[in-house]
A protein has these predicted regions:
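Conserved N-terminal segment of class I S-adenosyl-L-methionine
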Residues: 1-85, 89, 103-106, 137, ...
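Extended catalytic core of nucleotide-activated donor transferases of GT-like folds
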Residues: 261-345
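S-adenosyl-L-methionine-dependent methyltransferase catalytic module, highlighting the catalytic core
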Residues: 9-10, 35, 100-223
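Nucleotide-sugar-dependent
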Residues: 317-318, 387, 434-440, 447-470, ...
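Conserved acidic donor-binding segment of nucleotide-sugar-dependent glycosyltransferases
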Residues: 486-499, 507-512
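N-terminal pre-catalytic "stem/leader" segment of glycosyltransferase-like enzymes
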Residues: 223-289
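A charged, aromatic-enriched C-terminal amphipathic alpha-helix characteristic of glycosyltransferases
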Residues: 363, 513-552
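Conserved catalytic-core segment of nucleotide-activated headgroup transferases in glycan assembly
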Residues: 233-255, 362-363, 371-442
Length: 568
């Protein structure tokens, strides 16, 4: 195959997010330079990833990214694989069309799958409007890549893909079209419309067939039990929606049979029949005893939903919750929270409760060594934290004044903290989206995480420490919250007084190599314990258990809130 710039180093996101987050053994046929495997390893470092690649220069680059890289002909039955357990995932990303006999090859290699293993493929659609347009004009271009790639040997449509999967003895879980430039497909069908009746073609069926450039296929040895996870989230805020809702559900949706939808506004509910297993995960619902709220809850019950409240802050901070009889927790089937202290506060109102600590979806690349003489960049990013940082601002400024050329500070959100700094090198970023917040953090070397010892703060999670550690920052933090997760002197430094904070900053300034050492140990901690993929089995098991116990949970719910039994 020809190698246009970057051809072998692309990551197909529609494949990446469908690799089961729990996969431990993956074989990728046509791995290119290993970009897909490298991206997945950032989410699941424990995976063993084997790549097969015929193009020697791409395979050479993949060796540094993957666990095993094989050359040779993937269609050769004698191709020797390393000793592996049954595969959790077998991937063909735009490969089957290049094989001489993809039917025989796939049928043989599908036997390598574990009982719950997954076949994942991306296959070009020869029914695409651009192909039909060329054929109608009597042309078949030969190109370096794309639908007319000169190395394609076989061609597939939606129907022939279905037949390919069935011929391997696999059960089709998903056939997802990849559609680009839908307006061009619609224009093509519009041009053909006068002839459709005579050809016996339905306009919508034709449009559905000619729009996809490719299809993404998921299939397995056995049917996947369905589970629909719908979520009503808050409006986007820095980290809150991503970490608590979007990222965990995206990881769960990588599991066969699990489908997820997230909305910050309205959500079209599934109809009551057929009764597909379904949960609604509702982030911080403000449930009151007014008729409108009760009617919404009745509607969810009538449509067969198991309702889960997602909560991650001290409810006492919002008096309306108690004023409404804690309906936020009592008016749902179950509650999920981020910390055990928060669980202890909420559990008296609803005993069906799970604790899912905050996690990081994907590990950023390791940090490069600090350059000699380079200033240390300290990160602070928070809202409404003046009471937490004010006791330490004089200590920070004194440390900076001792060697102002050795320090720089990046501040996100908190203008007051930025303005209180006495340091030439300081940068302020206003309230921003989560991606920007993480980008600013990634530029830094040290994370400053002060938290005063208050009830409200004790209910908070250690998310900021996880984020900073994932980026390889050295962490200096208050013992409130962070003392329960950081290992003092190993994954971070804890301070309870000004002298301790001063000593940490001075030592790191004098020995900046320790900054990277703390960062590396913190990153290893996140990789071991705090990645989103590691929570998937626990979350899926609990959600499926809630559905299986829905009748009993609904009975308990109606006992807690008998008003929900009344008609609208």
């Amino acid at each position: 195959m020809s190698d246009p710039s970057g051809y072998h180093d692309r990551v197909n996101p529609d494949l990446l997010w469908r690799i089961p987050a729990t996969a431990r053994t993956v074989l990728e046929v046509g791995c290119g330079s290993g970009a897909l495997g490298q991206a997945f390893k950032a989410r699941q470092p424990a995976v063993t990833w084997v790549g097969i690649e015929a193009e020697s220069s791409a395979a050479a680059r993949a060796i540094g990214r993957l666990d095993h890289v094989l050359g040779g002909d993937v269609e050769d039955p004698a191709l020797a694989l390393p000793r592996l357990p049954p595969l959790d995932c077998l991937i063909y990303g735009d490969v089957l069309e290049h094989l001489r006999d993809p039917w025989a090859c796939l049928q043989r290699q599908a036997t390598w799958l574990a009982d719950d293993g997954l076949l994942l493929a991306c296959i070009p659609n020869v029914q695409h409007w651009s192909v039909l347009q060329q054929l109608l004009q009597g042309r078949w271009p030969r190109q370096d890549e794309g639908l007319f790639d000169r190395t394609h040997l076989r061609w597939f449509t939606r129907q022939s893909i279905i037949e390919l999967v069935a011929g391997c003895g696999l059960v089709l879980h998903e056939l997802q079209p990849r559609i680009f430039r839908p307006e061009q497909a619609a224009a093509f069908v519009q041009q053909l419309e006068p002839a459709l009746a005579g050809l016996g073609l339905d306009r919508q069926e034709l449009l559905d067939g000619v729009s996809p450039l490719q299809y993404v296929v998921r299939a397995g040895r056995r049917p996947a039990p369905p589970l629909q996870l719908d979520a009503l989230s808050l409006r986007p805020q820095v980290g809150m929606v991503d970490v608590r809702i979007s990222q965990p559900l995206r990881a769960l949706a990588s599991r066969p049979g699990v489908n997820a939808r997230v909305s910050a506004g309205s959500l079209a509910l599934l109809p009551a029949e057929p009764l597909t297993p379904r949960l609604l995960i509702w982030q911080r619902p403000a449930l009151t005893m007014d008729p409108e709220t009760l009617q919404r809850l009745r509607l969810l019950l009538r449509n067969g939903y198991v309702m889960v409240c997602e909560y991650d802050d001290d409810p006492a901070h919002w008096p309306a919750i108690a004023a409404n009889g804690h309906l936020t927790f009592r008016g749902v089937h179950a509650v999920q929270v981020s910390t055990e202290p928060l669980a202890e506060v909420i559990r008296p109102h609803n005993a069906e409760l799970a604790v899912f600590g905050n996690t990081i979806e994907s590990l950023p690349p390791p940090r490069p060594p600090l350059l000699p003489g380079e200033p240390l960049r300290l990160f602070f990013g928070a809202l409404n934290r003046e009471a937490d940082w004010a006791p330490w601002i004089d200590t920070l400024n004194a440390a900076f004044a001792a060697a102002p050329d050795r320090w720089a500070v990046e501040v996100v959100h908190d203008r007051g903290f930025h303005d209180a700094l006495v340091l030439p090198r300081r940068t302020f970023t206003p309230t921003c989206d989560y991606a920007t917040y993480r980008q600013v953090m990634a530029r830094c070397d040290i994370a400053f995480l002060p938290l005063g010892d208050t009830r409200f703060n004790r209910m908070k999670s250690d998310l900021k420490a996880i984020e900073a550690a994932a980026h390889g920052l050295a962490i200096v933090a208050s013992p409130t919250v962070y003392g329960d997760s950081l290992q003092e002197g190993v994954t971070g430094r804890l301070f309870s007084n000004a002298d301790q904070l001063r000593q940490v900053l001075e030592k790191w300034r004098q020995a900046p190599e320790q900054v990277r050492a703390y960062g590396a140990r913190g990153r290893a901690w996140v990789a071991r314990e705090r990645l989103t993929a590691q929570q998937v089995p626990q979350r899926e098991a609990w959600y499926r258990s809630l559905w299986e116990r829905r009748d009993e949970l609904t009975r308990q719910l109606l006992q807690r809130v008998p008003q929900l039994q009344n008609p609208a």
